[in-house]
Protein backbone atom coordinates (compact mmCIF):
# COMPACT_ATOMS: atom_id res chain seq x y z
CA UNK A 1 0.00 0.00 0.00
CA UNK A 2 1.33 3.40 -0.90
CA UNK A 3 -1.38 5.32 0.90
CA UNK A 4 0.11 7.27 3.79
CA UNK A 5 -2.68 6.54 6.26
CA UNK A 6 -5.54 4.13 5.76
CA UNK A 7 -8.94 5.73 5.87
CA UNK A 8 -11.14 4.52 8.73
CA UNK A 9 -14.16 2.78 7.21
CA UNK A 10 -17.44 1.88 8.89
CA UNK A 11 -20.83 0.60 7.85
CA UNK A 12 -24.05 1.24 9.71
CA UNK A 13 -25.54 -2.22 9.32
CA UNK A 14 -29.33 -2.32 9.50
CA UNK A 15 -29.61 -6.10 8.99
CA UNK A 16 -32.13 -5.82 6.14
CA UNK A 17 -30.46 -8.12 3.58
CA UNK A 18 -29.33 -11.73 3.31
CA UNK A 19 -26.28 -11.93 5.62
CA UNK A 20 -24.60 -14.44 3.28
CA UNK A 21 -24.61 -11.85 0.48
CA UNK A 22 -23.82 -8.82 2.65
CA UNK A 23 -20.63 -7.20 1.39
CA UNK A 24 -20.21 -5.10 4.55
CA UNK A 25 -20.23 -8.20 6.75
CA UNK A 26 -17.70 -9.90 4.48
CA UNK A 27 -15.42 -6.86 4.69
CA UNK A 28 -15.80 -6.88 8.47
CA UNK A 29 -14.82 -10.56 8.63
CA UNK A 30 -11.68 -9.66 6.67
CA UNK A 31 -10.87 -6.80 9.05
CA UNK A 32 -11.36 -4.13 6.37
CA UNK A 33 -14.17 -2.21 8.08
CA UNK A 34 -16.24 -2.12 11.23
CA UNK A 35 -19.98 -2.74 11.14
CA UNK A 36 -22.05 -0.78 13.64
CA UNK A 37 -25.56 -1.96 14.45
CA UNK A 38 -26.36 1.09 16.57
CA UNK A 39 -26.24 4.49 14.93
CA UNK A 40 -25.08 6.04 18.19
CA UNK A 41 -21.89 3.96 18.08
CA UNK A 42 -20.96 5.05 14.54
CA UNK A 43 -18.35 7.69 13.77
CA UNK A 44 -19.26 11.24 14.73
CA UNK A 45 -17.13 12.99 12.09
CA UNK A 46 -16.60 12.28 8.43
CA UNK A 47 -18.78 11.42 5.47
CA UNK A 48 -21.90 9.30 5.22
CA UNK A 49 -22.54 7.80 1.79
CA UNK A 50 -26.16 8.71 1.23
CA UNK A 51 -27.77 7.82 -2.11
CA UNK A 52 -30.43 10.49 -1.51
CA UNK A 53 -28.02 13.36 -0.76
CA UNK A 54 -27.87 16.34 -3.10
CA UNK A 55 -24.15 16.90 -2.50
CA UNK A 56 -21.74 14.93 -4.69
CA UNK A 57 -18.61 13.32 -3.30
CA UNK A 58 -15.48 14.91 -4.76
CA UNK A 59 -11.71 14.68 -4.23
CA UNK A 60 -12.05 17.76 -1.99
CA UNK A 61 -13.80 15.56 0.60
CA UNK A 62 -10.56 13.74 1.46
CA UNK A 63 -9.87 16.03 4.45
CA UNK A 64 -13.31 15.36 5.94
CA UNK A 65 -12.73 11.63 5.59
CA UNK A 66 -9.16 11.71 6.92
CA UNK A 67 -10.26 13.73 9.96
CA UNK A 68 -13.13 11.33 10.66
CA UNK A 69 -14.39 8.27 8.81
CA UNK A 70 -15.98 7.10 5.63
CA UNK A 71 -19.33 5.59 6.61
CA UNK A 72 -21.69 3.58 4.42
CA UNK A 73 -25.30 2.81 5.16
CA UNK A 74 -25.70 -0.94 4.69
CA UNK A 75 -29.39 -1.54 4.07
CA UNK A 76 -31.80 -2.91 1.51
CA UNK A 77 -32.34 -0.83 -1.63
CA UNK A 78 -36.06 -1.61 -1.15
CA UNK A 79 -36.02 0.28 2.17
CA UNK A 80 -33.55 3.03 1.31
CA UNK A 81 -35.89 6.00 1.88
CA UNK A 82 -36.90 5.03 5.42
CA UNK A 83 -33.33 3.97 6.28
CA UNK A 84 -31.80 7.27 5.15
CA UNK A 85 -34.51 9.22 6.97
CA UNK A 86 -33.71 7.44 10.25
CA UNK A 87 -29.96 7.89 9.88
CA UNK A 88 -30.06 11.54 8.78
CA UNK A 89 -31.96 12.51 11.93
CA UNK A 90 -29.41 10.92 14.24
CA UNK A 91 -25.98 11.71 12.78
CA UNK A 92 -23.80 14.74 12.22
CA UNK A 93 -21.85 13.10 9.42
CA UNK A 94 -21.71 15.06 6.16
CA UNK A 95 -23.93 13.34 3.57
CA UNK A 96 -22.54 12.72 0.10
CA UNK A 97 -23.84 10.90 -2.94
CA UNK A 98 -21.53 9.24 -5.41
CA UNK A 99 -21.47 10.50 -8.99
CA UNK A 100 -22.97 8.11 -11.52
CA UNK A 101 -21.27 4.71 -11.58
CA UNK A 102 -22.38 1.27 -12.74
CA UNK A 103 -22.82 -1.68 -10.41
CA UNK A 104 -20.53 -4.64 -11.04
CA UNK A 105 -22.13 -7.01 -8.54
CA UNK A 106 -24.18 -9.94 -9.88
CA UNK A 107 -27.46 -8.72 -8.33
CA UNK A 108 -27.48 -5.27 -9.98
CA UNK A 109 -24.83 -5.60 -12.72
CA UNK A 110 -24.74 -2.59 -15.02
CA UNK A 111 -27.40 -0.60 -13.17
CA UNK A 112 -26.64 3.04 -12.46
CA UNK A 113 -25.93 3.68 -8.81
CA UNK A 114 -27.21 0.30 -7.52
CA UNK A 115 -23.89 -0.61 -5.96
CA UNK A 116 -23.19 -2.89 -3.07
CA UNK A 117 -21.75 -1.38 0.10
CA UNK A 118 -18.28 -2.63 -0.88
CA UNK A 119 -18.53 -1.05 -4.34
CA UNK A 120 -19.72 2.28 -2.93
CA UNK A 121 -16.94 2.42 -0.35
CA UNK A 122 -14.33 1.43 -2.91
CA UNK A 123 -15.55 4.05 -5.39
CA UNK A 124 -15.45 6.71 -2.67
CA UNK A 125 -11.88 5.87 -1.76
CA UNK A 126 -10.87 5.89 -5.42
CA UNK A 127 -12.46 9.30 -6.04
CA UNK A 128 -10.72 10.92 -3.05
CA UNK A 129 -7.36 9.57 -4.21
CA UNK A 130 -6.96 6.46 -2.07
CA UNK A 131 -6.77 4.06 -5.02
CA UNK A 132 -4.73 1.33 -3.32
CA UNK A 133 -7.17 1.08 -0.43
CA UNK A 134 -10.08 1.21 -2.90
CA UNK A 135 -8.74 -1.73 -4.88
CA UNK A 136 -7.90 -3.77 -1.77
CA UNK A 137 -11.47 -3.33 -0.53
CA UNK A 138 -12.76 -5.21 -3.59
CA UNK A 139 -10.29 -8.11 -3.53
CA UNK A 140 -12.56 -10.39 -1.45
CA UNK A 141 -15.24 -10.28 -4.16
CA UNK A 142 -15.43 -12.11 -7.49
CA UNK A 143 -17.13 -9.04 -8.97
CA UNK A 144 -14.42 -6.64 -7.76
CA UNK A 145 -12.50 -6.63 -11.04
CA UNK A 146 -15.75 -6.32 -13.02
CA UNK A 147 -16.71 -3.23 -11.02
CA UNK A 148 -13.33 -1.63 -11.62
CA UNK A 149 -13.34 -2.55 -15.32
CA UNK A 150 -16.83 -1.09 -15.80
CA UNK A 151 -15.97 2.14 -14.00
CA UNK A 152 -12.23 2.72 -14.38
CA UNK A 153 -12.59 5.57 -16.88
CA UNK A 154 -15.29 7.20 -14.75
CA UNK A 155 -13.34 6.81 -11.52
CA UNK A 156 -10.19 8.27 -13.08
CA UNK A 157 -12.19 11.19 -14.45
CA UNK A 158 -13.97 11.90 -11.17
CA UNK A 159 -10.75 11.63 -9.16
CA UNK A 160 -9.10 14.23 -11.41
CA UNK A 161 -11.74 16.87 -10.67
CA UNK A 162 -11.06 19.85 -8.40
CA UNK A 163 -14.57 20.49 -7.10
CA UNK A 164 -18.07 19.09 -6.72
CA UNK A 165 -19.14 21.24 -9.66
CA UNK A 166 -16.48 19.66 -11.86
CA UNK A 167 -17.55 16.17 -10.74
CA UNK A 168 -21.15 16.99 -11.61
CA UNK A 169 -20.20 18.28 -15.06
CA UNK A 170 -17.89 15.32 -15.63
CA UNK A 171 -20.67 12.78 -15.05
CA UNK A 172 -22.76 14.44 -17.78
CA UNK A 173 -19.88 14.00 -20.22
CA UNK A 174 -20.40 10.24 -19.82
CA UNK A 175 -24.15 9.99 -19.22
CA UNK A 176 -27.27 11.70 -20.52
CA UNK A 177 -28.40 14.54 -18.31
CA UNK A 178 -31.93 14.04 -16.93
CA UNK A 179 -34.41 16.23 -18.80
CA UNK A 180 -35.35 18.10 -15.59
CA UNK A 181 -31.74 19.39 -15.34
CA UNK A 182 -31.65 20.91 -18.83
Per-region residue spans from a language model:
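Short, extreme N-terminal leader segments that mark the start of a protein/domain
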Residues: 1-34
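Active-site cofactor/cluster-binding pocket
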Residues: 20-25, 31-116, 120, 127-156
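Long, charged alpha-helical interface segments
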Residues: 152-182
Amino acid sequence: MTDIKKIRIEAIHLDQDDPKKCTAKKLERRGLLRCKTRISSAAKRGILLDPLSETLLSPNDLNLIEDGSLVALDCSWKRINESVRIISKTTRLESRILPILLAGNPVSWGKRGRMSTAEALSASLYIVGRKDQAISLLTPFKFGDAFLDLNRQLLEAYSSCNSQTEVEEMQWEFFDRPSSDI
